[in-house]
Every structure is written in structure tokens, then in C-alpha cells.
């Protein structure tokens, strides 16, 4: 029997606010444990939560970017459960009346086709604290710094049918929330976490199978590996006549497997009820319009503009717009020097710069070569001061911190030889010293032109303009 995976994702996105969702405590990452938790975060008697307006604005911003509806009001509810890092004994979340409803996000599959993934809802909630078990003898520690940090939980429809589609959706969502400034979405810091709901059903059937939920997967690769393992696990059980247990599972990256944590809770297990300390949130059309007017250019809008304005290939556009920081870097280079061909800038950013960043595990915001320095280098390539190979040499020197392109060119004597008279003298010598190859070229072996150009490049220590040399040889031969 052929089985079809049915996958839905719940993504927890930490909102980019200076303070927490219901208190004035800071949300900065990396502070000493329990130094950013106030009485409200700890749920001490007599305190009352006050909603952070910026969190509401960011949630609405996300909703508009995925073509969702923003209801006129939403309600906060208490989600009741016990866990040591949940100080109040309940989490303030949203249940029946979320702030964002019925949106969608289009993804591009590996074969180039587009698929629309529905977004059921996105709701605001507070994060819990964090438990620590390692390095503690006989006890666990709790850091409440994260408690009360604003989260937007984004729940997809069960429209995903493979691990590849799940990763494509996550990457598109990750890119979007960074583009619109909703979140830094730093996965290493837990600002973008994913729960995977997965079930199998016979291909062609409409009825859903029993699902398992894999909690808190924090990398694209781990999501893919967890889904592939879970599909095989459930398939093996079903084909051997067993039944799938509805449960919560954990992905173990070391063993590359999912393990059972507990049976899966239903909504009634959490005893949701409206939080009496918080009024319903009214969201008027004026507020929505104000947020809409502040929406930045969305990723798919930027891709369309790049292709039209800069005449770039889909491949180049896709690489340049993967991250907003890369797109901004590219456009900054072109704004600094309008004589630089966009294709030249795209080639260097997607090629040499990307390779150097990956090799050193750096983001483009950490690049030792800023946009102004790269623009200086590309200007010298565009005006034929440097050949492509010489440009690479300058790039490597610049990466090492030796200054801008002009300084390096002057210091190392790297200026390209473009003087026609000087080049013709060298070309004449090459022709005189290689009569056999000249005869072969004239009898039809056109590929020998590369040999002649190579001889000139060798004689000039790579400083000749290879295109110019090529043209001069063809004239003389």
C-alpha cells in the first residue's frame, strides 16, 4: 500500500520587542539567569499583566503579509498545565479568538513549481522559562528570563506532503518574519522553533490518520530528518498491522530518531478559559491601515523587482533575496557606484563573498568586506583596471584587512596592463617563439588561441587583460 504523509507545522516565533508581552522586563538574549524576570513574569500575588502594544502591531504586520484576516477583537485565555518552568501554573495564550486567521504562504518546490500552504491561525502568547538539567548534581535549575517573552505561534493547515515541502515552508516563513522585522528568528537562540504534526493515510483517502507531534525542533535539517524518520516509523507500524498512538515525541539528533515523551494532550486537558485580568483586544480599521502603510517590501515583491530592474536570472534573484541582509548589501553596492553592472555584483556576492562567508561561518552582516569596499573592487574590475583573476587576489587581500581595493592595487602593483602597444610587443614575441602552434592555428585549430593568451598572461604575470589579448591575437593571426 502507498502511504501519503499529512503534515502540519506549528512555529513559535519570538517577537522583536524590547520588553515582554505583559511586563516591562527586558527581552535581551544572553543575560545572567533570572536577571530579566520581574514580579509579573513570576506570577507573584497582586500583580496584573499589561499588554505590550508593539507585540500586537507585529502580529498584525505578520497577518497582513500572509493575506490573513485580522478580526475586530481577540481574546487572551489561560492555558492551564503544570511544569516547573511555568511560574503561574498557566500560560497566557489565545484559543477561540486568535489575532490572525486564515492566511497563506506560497512555497517553491525543488522542481520549480509553486504550492500554497494555508495558515489556519497565528496567536499571541507568552513564552515559558527554561529548565537546566546538565551540570547539576541531583537537581534542576530554572532560568525565568525567557518567561513572558512575546511569541507568535503560527499554525499551518495540514497541506504539507513531504519533508522537502516542510523545509521549504519553514524557510519561506523564516525569511518572511525577518524581512518584515517581526523577529530576528535566530534559531540558535530559540527565537524560531517548530513543532511537527505528522500522520499517514492511504494515498487517495481524505480521512486523516492518527498524528504524532514532534516538539521543539530547532533547525531546518533536523525538521527534515525528524519527518523522514517519523514517516518510516509510522509506515512500519501500519504495514505490520499496528496502530499509531497519538503522542508527543522528541527528536534526538544524535541518534537520528524520534522518541516518545508523553501521550498527546487534547485542548480540553488544558482547561482554556478567558483570562479575567486582560480585556479583549479591539483592533480597529485605523490601526490595521496604519500597520499596512508601514509594511516593508515583502520577499516575493523584492524578487519580482530584482528580476525586472536588474535583469538578473531567477537563480541570482533567489540567492540574493534569501535573506534581507544579502538583498540590502547588494543594493547598497549598486547605490554606492551606479557604474557597476548588476550582474557583476550578483556574481561576486553569490560567488566569492558567499563562499568566504560560508567557509568562515559568518553572516553577511559580519563580513570583513563591507558594501563600500566591495563596490570599490567591482569598480576596478568594471573599468578594466583589474582582470577577474586579479580581482580575486585583491578580494583575498581585502578579506585579510589590508584596506580598500585602490590601496591594495597600489601597494601590490596589481594594475592590469591594457596598453595596446605594450601588449602587441609581447604578442609578437609569442608568435615568433611558437611557429608550430601558429601554423596549426592557421590551419583550423582555433582552440590554440587559449595557448597563446596563456603565454601572454604568463609573460605579464597575470596582469594582461585576457579579453583584449584574445582580440589582438585574432587580428594578428
From Swiss-Prot:
Pfam (any one): GatB_N
UniProt GO molecular function: asparaginyl-tRNA synthase (glutamine-hydrolyzing) activity; ATP binding; glutaminyl-tRNA synthase (glutamine-hydrolyzing) activity
EC number: 6.3.5.-
Matching PROSITE patterns: GATB (PS01234)
Electron transport among keywords: no
UniProt GO BP: glutaminyl-tRNAGln biosynthesis via transamidation; translation
Reactions performed catalytically: L-glutamyl-tRNA(Gln) + L-glutamine + ATP + H2O = L-glutaminyl-tRNA(Gln) + L-glutamate + ADP + phosphate + H(+); L-aspartyl-tRNA(Asn) + L-glutamine + ATP + H2O = L-asparaginyl-tRNA(Asn) + L-glutamate + ADP + phosphate + 2 H(+)
Keywords: ATP-binding, Ligase, Nucleotide-binding, Protein biosynthesis
Record keyword Protein biosynthesis present: yes
Family under the similarity heading: Belongs to the GatB/GatE family. GatB subfamily.
Subunit structure: Heterotrimer of A, B and C subunits.
Function description: Allows the formation of correctly charged Asn-tRNA(Asn) or Gln-tRNA(Gln) through the transamidation of misacylated Asp-tRNA(Asn) or Glu-tRNA(Gln) in organisms which lack either or both of asparaginyl-tRNA or glutaminyl-tRNA synthetases. The reaction takes place in the presence of glutamine and ATP through an activated phospho-Asp-tRNA(Asn) or phospho-Glu-tRNA(Gln).
Record's protein name: Aspartyl/glutamyl-tRNA(Asn/Gln) amidotransferase subunit B
Protein species of origin: Coxiella burnetii (strain Dugway 5J108-111)
The organism's taxonomic lineage, starting at the top: Bacteria, Pseudomonadati, Pseudomonadota, Gammaproteobacteria, Legionellales
